Amino acid sequence: EVPEKGDMEAFLTDGLRSLLNSIPVIEMSEYTVRWPGHIQMFIDKRDSGVLDEVDLQAQWQYDSKTPEFTWMEVMAEAFDGRRVTWTVQDHGCDDGHSMARCTGLVTYCCIIEWLEDPDMLPPGVHAPESLPSEVISRIINMMLDEGVEIIGPMTSHS
């Protein structure tokens, strides 16, 4: 259940691959959360042959008049059994929709940090979790300044 949104469904997806190389992980899973019936509707349309890609792409166009939100919960359990949870939530605003704000702002903040310190990382592709902890803290604060709600450890807004 998502607070203030109600019951949701979740299905396994793959977006944690960078953690395999950056954090000592024994087991991990990622679920995408959607309204009840969401995935089954698309399975049924696909299986019946009525899934229209052109119509689907038109529906994916951003419409600032359509309210939307992004909600993410990250739970981690340490080897000693300690658990921590972070919740990220955004409802979008005039400058973009919520998913772009929750993911794109991270990239934007990383670029700002890199421009200020080009020697921070060697050339290549780097996941945000490979950044120094003080950089991650600044990125979290930038996201909070932009109105993205982040609740959990290390999210004190200074």
What is each residue range found by the language model?
Residues E1-S158:
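C-terminal catalytic/substrate-binding lobe primarily of soluble NAD(P)-dependent oxidoreductases
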